[in-house]
Amino acid sequence: MITKQSSNESFDVIVVGGGHAGCEAALTSARLGLNTALFTLNLDRIAWQPCNPAVGGPAKSQLVHEVDALGGIIGKLADLTALQKRVLNASRGPAVRALRAQTDKRSYAHEMLKILQNTPNLKIREAMVTGLEIEHYPNQIDQKTPEIQERIGFIKGIKTYFGSVFHAKAVVLTTGTFLGGRIWIGNQSMSAGRAGEQASEGLTEELKKLGFTTDRLKTGTPARVDRRTIDLDSLDEQLSDASDKFFSFDPLSWKSGEQMSCHITRTTKETHQLIKNNLHLTPIYGGFIDSKGPRYCPSIEDKIVRFADKDSHQIFLEPEGRDTPEMYVQGFSTGLPENLQLELLRTLPGLQNCVMLRPAYAVEYDYIPATQLEATLETKRISGLYSAGQLNGTTGYEEAAAQGLVAGLNAARLVNNKEGIIFERESSYIGTMIDDLVTKDLKEPYRVLTSRSEYRLILRGDNADRRLTPLGYQLGLIDERRWNIFNAKQQLINQEKERLDKERIKESDKCAKEIFSSTGTPIKGSLTLANFLRRTNIHYKDLITYNLTTQSIPLDVEEAVEIDIKYSGYLERQKAQINQLKQQSKKLLPKNLNYNNIETLSKEAREKLTISQPKSLGHAAQVPGVSKADLTALLVWLKIEKMKKVKRKDSLQITN
């Protein structure tokens, strides 16, 4: 509709929602010079961590590094508020290693609010957004069929619950679990986006009127228990092992407070039996809701049903902050009634006398299947309307933050009449995630995983700055100070790699005998330091041990040099694969191609490609329902057709 009301205020970009996606979107837009407003239901819950107060983990830490490399904030705040840091998969290859930080959730939210309040061009407003102001294109007003993907109009602003109108040239929706949010404990439920906070009303209905398809998903969070009532001395202690590692590439953010321990307990036979006896009382198994939950973060009842052969599951007790006794019981989310939850907690070793401060609950909410979005995160139906975070069907603060940055960036570029930026899946986990979201028909909350990327050896966390900071600088997301820091680091890396390629160890050197004595591997003749570093059991720290370094260099430079040299062959092969893929994606497909005649394609791919008639192999890759196997089949078909043409041409020449 075209509003007849006067606008309370006008902005270039409005962001709806103050979670991790919304904060990144608003900050990105404002830092690009756009007059930006962030609307949130509750100013006291900005960037709240309603579930696990932690940042990072496999693939998630890579996302955080990438967001930081593009000027985002999540990595800096995770470093600033970290209670504990650990490197996961430390014994495995660099492609799957991950940094994870337990954070102080209240401090994290407080620091984010301070940043938002002190960012030029950014205003914050507390209000419930219930409607969108749209100007329809001529003859498009009644076109509300979800299957029709062409644009029907463009965004003009938003409307709040109490009737205020705010105009904007672009709007980013980052509503999290608040659209139609309903929390469940057993068979009891109430309208809420999360415990203690009201759900958002009206916006889902508005989106449906505009022709968007919406659906429902669910997630859950475990109980919080009082640290003072847990026998921590009887449990295994998990210490921090990475206080010297950071998410951010900015040295000004390299701060670590006193580290806190986590503790480990396990479920028991009593735990499992109590759950089995009461499955019918949970929202899912009792049939009260049927929304899909996150596959990779299952409830404890899901674990016991799905892994019936296991008689115990590991549970982590994690602090929520320095100034609170609350402990997060990781791996123990449940939908059981509140009166059974304390009994269940007390079956865990060390928690026999625990006090439950907050019960576990499940939350069900509306989302927009992301196939209705462009790869820029702009909606296909409404120009200037963007969507990011859990509203797109993802789960996790890291996934939300990355989408928020992309949506905020592209909303700002739209206002400035610039072309949107698409992150390719081979260039970043951000690109991998968005490509998956907008091209695949996902039916459960999406979590980024290293296994989702075909190029994970290249898309590591340690080189996110090398991959993305030049782009960030070009786009105006990285300032001169950060750019100078980046260039100085690259110079150090290159200089050290050149040195290691030139300098050699000789069999007669004193250190050669020390190396043989400690490793059992002799130095024969002479060997470049680079080739020495390529040995399986040798790391950069060994160069320091054997006095084979000329200067002290930062830890991040050491790691970059070691990975570049040790995995050079693999990296070159993967780069070649990416270049080949880029060339293949440019291959044109014939007009009006009858895909039903290509028997090697899946039935779904034939149907989807027949309708969409993509111009190239790259465009075919963007069609929902077309798999990698289908693309390979198309590539083979193109090669066969090319060979047939050559044969026909040769045959004609012989005939003539």
From Swiss-Prot:
Cofactor: FAD
Positions bound to NAD(+): 293-307
GO BP annotations, alphabetical order: tRNA methylation; tRNA wobble uridine modification
InterPro entries per UniProt: FAD/NAD-bd_sf, GIDA_C_N, MnmG, MnmG-rel, MnmG-rel_CS, MnmG_C, MnmG_C_subdom, MnmG_C_subdom_sf
A GO term for molecular function: flavin adenine dinucleotide binding
Record's keyword annotation contains Chaperone: no
Keyword field: Cytoplasm, FAD, Flavoprotein, NAD, tRNA processing
Compartments where located: Cytoplasm
Pfam families registered for this protein in UniProt: GIDA, GIDA_C_1st, SAM_GIDA_C
Coiled coil residues, start to end: none
GO CC annotation: cytoplasm
Superkingdom assignment: Bacteria
SUPFAM superfamilies from the UniProt entry: FAD/NAD(P)-binding domain (SSF51905)
Residues annotated to bind FAD: 17-22, 129, 200, 390
Keyword tRNA processing annotated: yes
Subunit structure of this chain's protein: Homodimer. Heterotetramer of two MnmE and two MnmG subunits.
Protein function: NAD-binding protein involved in the addition of a carboxymethylaminomethyl (cmnm) group at the wobble position (U34) of certain tRNAs, forming tRNA-cmnm(5)s(2)U34.
PANTHER family to which the protein is assigned, alphabetical: GLUCOSE INHIBITED DIVISION PROTEIN A, PROTEIN MTO1 HOMOLOG, MITOCHONDRIAL
Assigned protein family: Belongs to the MnmG family.
Protein name as it appears in the record: tRNA uridine 5-carboxymethylaminomethyl modification enzyme MnmG
Origin species: Prochlorococcus marinus (strain NATL1A)
Gene: mnmG
